[in-house]
Design a protein with these regions (language model features):
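Membrane-lipid interaction segments
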Residues: 1-468
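Extracellular LysM carbohydrate-binding repeats and other cell-envelope/extracellular binding modules
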Residues: 473, 491-523
């Protein structure tokens, strides 16, 4: 018997391995830089230069890029140092192969840059590398059966979430920022932060729409010695699109966005004065788009007057439990460690770290930390620019009712981000931190079921056929369907409906039916 089959595509996680890299290195202050009095602020990011699979080992090579803002000795001057530390880590793996999509995510768990003496700094970092191997696979399932011998079949509806689009791409943002008229010309950029805020990316027909803001903060030195330290903040909106030929606006997105390159440089304006900032960033995007389908799957087959041999096999499909885009508004207080008198808050910067995610009956219970840096000006002539760091815990429940089975067997992914962050001085050495944290979650459930793989129709033994009753009077039992009754007595559904004058398929318990045997066996 011929079966019409359709293909179901899914992405299956084959292996995930977590490794930690410890970096500890002394850095010499370049000769062109002033002696270091004390570190004000530092930041770092990782660039993975190479990921290569070699048998049962995954080699990851990259660099930790860091920047330091510091107070110089014997002056009120602020200066900066930039550098990088190379690293290479070999991760032992078991199930990864070259055919898999291998993704390595990084996170800076801890970063500490301390002063050894005025010409040397110590840089310590703890990186977590998470290597995940994904396998794209397809499952064939039977939709219908065709044989021309009067076979009867019944189908069921299967809801599946199929992987429709998987791609990696980059989105480049280039803007020029003009200084306001009350700002002096730029001599040297000492510090900058360029962070994405409130990025939204959604699928459309044939493309991906992306929009959001880049939050720019820049400290610079003016061209004249008597000019005090200058800083500015700007929100740079952007919008655009990326080509994705197979995308449709009904698809369910799972998109990870991370800056992989950031730069802010001073440049001349049309009058030849250093009054512009050339801002550039590159966003790396890992895109997975899912399509929810309701498939009609062949569930059972029989043939009146014949023996039917069914061969089945297990098939695993993904089902979307929930997708949720949440925003958590948090307000907390941050205490200063010393009795600084704050004259002005310059800038607040932060990152979100997810510490634990636990599926519950009510949804995903998320515990995390908002790591905050607040740069401010203190009433201290020797070191006016200072920074306070804090770690603010939060807990949030992503509403998504989960069954006991889903809690144990579901796979979930949560992408966190920061949409808004602000700091306000309360007095008494306290700052009020307000933030809007974005939590985009997707919960999938893998369902394994037996599906019909092949059907063979065999002629019934004539003696067996002759022993079947010619006419049967049957009383409908609870849970009976026309299909079950017809299969039990080797009859056809249409014949039962015609003989009993039934207009539909609905039956009532206690209802009486007359079932007539097929006139001849299958041959």
């Amino acid at each position: 018997m011929e079966l019409t089959k359709t293909s179901i595509h899914r992405n299956r996680q084959k292996e995930q391995v977590i490794s930690q890299v410890t970096l500890d290195e002394d850095v010499i202050v370049p000769d062109a830089k002033a002696d270091v009095e004390g570190v004000i602020l530092d930041c770092a990011e990782v660039d993975l230069e190479e990921v290569r699979l070699m048998g049962n080992r995954l080699m990851v090579r990259g660099r930790l890029y860091f920047r330091v803002l510091y107070h110089a000795q014997k002056s009120r001057m602020v200066d900066n140092i930039e550098g990088s530390l190379p690293f290479e880590e070999t991760i032992n793996v078991k199930a990864m192969c070259d055919d898999h999509e291998i993704r390595v995510d990084w996170e800076i768990e801890d970063m500490n840059i301390s002063l050894i003496h005025s010409r040397k700094l110590n840089v310590k970092g703890l990186l977590t590398l998470t290597a995940t191997a994904w396998e794209s696979c397809s499952e064939l399932v039977a939709e219908s059966a065709e044989d021309g011998h009067g076979a009867e079949s019944v189908s069921r509806v299967l809801e599946v979430a199929q992987l429709a689009v998987q791609m990696r791409d980059t989105y480049r943002i280039k803007e020029e920022v003009e200084l306001s008229s009350n700002k002096p010309n730029i001599d040297q950029i000492l510090w900058y932060r360029l962070e994405p805020r409130g990025i939204e990316c959604r699928p459309l027909d044939g493309k991906l729409s992306i929009h959001g803001e880049m939050e720019l903060f820049c400290i610079y030195k003016g061209q004249e010695e008597h000019i005090p330290l200058q800083w500015l903040e700007r929100s740079i909106p952007f919008s655009g699109a990326l080509e994705a030929a197979e995308s449709t606006d009904e698809m369910i997105p799972e998109i990870r966005i991370r800056p992989v390159h950031r730069s802010v440089e001073a440049k001349e304006d049309y009058d030849g004065e250093m009054r512009q900032l050339a801002v550039e960033t590159v966003l790396e995007m890992e895109v997975a788009l899912y399509r929810e389908d309701r498939l009609t799957v062949l569930d059972d087959v029989y043939c009146p007057g014949a023996d039917v041999i069914l061969q089945s096999r297990p098939v695993t499909v993904d089902r979307l439990v929930t997708r949720n885009g949440s925003k958590y508004k948090m307000t907390d207080k941050l205490s200063l460690s010393n009795a600084d008198k704050i004259l002005q808050i310059c800038h607040a910067d932060g990152t979100v770290k997810l510490d634990r995610i636990r599926p519950t009956g009510d949804g995903l219970d998320i515990e995390g930390t908002l790591c905050v840096d607040v740069l401010y000006v203190a009433a201290d002539d020797q070191s006016p620019v200072r920074c306070v760091r804090g770690m603010l815990p939060f807990q949030y429940l992503v509403a998504a009712p989960l069954s006991e089975r889903s809690q144990k067997e579901c796979t979930y992914r949560v992408i966190s981000g920061l949409e808004q962050l602000s700091a306000m001085l309360l007095g008494n050495g306290e700052l009020e931190i307000k933030a809007v944290i974005t939590l985009d979650s997707i919960v999938m459930e893998s369902v394994t079921m037996d599906t019909i793989d092949s059907v063979q129709v065999m002629p019934m033994d004539p003696k067996k056929f002759d022993r079947l009753p010619g006419i049967v009077g049957y009383v409908v039992q609870k849970g009976d369907t026309l299909w079950k009754i017809a299969k039990k007595f080797y009859a056809s559904v249409d014949n039962i409906k015609e003989v009993n004058g039934l207009l539909g398929d609905d039956l009532m318990p206690g209802q009486k039916l007359l079932i007539i045997k097929e006139t001849r066996p299958f041959s």
